[in-house]
A protein has these predicted regions:
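Histidine-centered metal-chelating micro-motifs
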Residues: 36-37, 56, 72, 76-81
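Glycine- and acidic-residue-biased ligand/ion/polar-headgroup-sensing regions
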Residues: 44-55
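Short acidic-glycine-tyrosine-enriched beta hairpin
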Residues: 61-76
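Short histidine-centered beta-strand/loop micro-motifs
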Residues: 16-18, 36-42, 83-85
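Ligand-binding loop in jelly-roll beta-barrel domains
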Residues: 76-98
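A short, N-terminal "cap"/entry segment at the start of jelly-roll beta-barrel domains
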Residues: 1-23
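A generic "binding-loop/recognition-motif" signal
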Residues: 35, 43-44, 62, 78-79, ...
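Conserved short histidine dyad/triad with adjacent acidic residue
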Residues: 12, 26-42
Length: 98
């Protein structure tokens, strides 16, 4: 999409309103990296945005693959963990929201 009054500019909407941002970080996840090693829960949610590579989110007994330039909101009350899903490094932004 190109926003109004922009030229030679392309954008991809990653997410809309998701809550209040608590904090954020850039993660560099190496081959076979991720965590935590056991699924966990908490009160806040995670918004993950993959900028390089590919991430695999384990959600209870299912998994979700997040490709480069995609985002996914993980509800904190659902048991989850996050892992690199490629043979190289995955880089992603994690934003904690409530």
């Amino acid at each position: 999409m190109t926003p109004p009054k922009h030229v030679n500019f392309r954008a991809k909407r990653l997410f809309g309103a998701v809550g209040n941002i608590v904090d954020g970080a850039v993660a560099y996840i190496d081959l076979d990296g991720g965590g935590p090693t056991e699924l966990h829960t908490h009160e806040h949610n995670h918004l993950f945005i993959v900028t390089e590579g590919e991430a695999k989110i384990l959600l209870g007994d299912k998994e979700v693959i997040i490709h480069k330039d995609e985002a996914f909101l993980v509800e904190g009350r659902i048991p989850h963990s996050c892992w690199n899903n490629i043979d190289g490094m995955t880089k992603m932004i994690g934003i904690t929201v409530i």
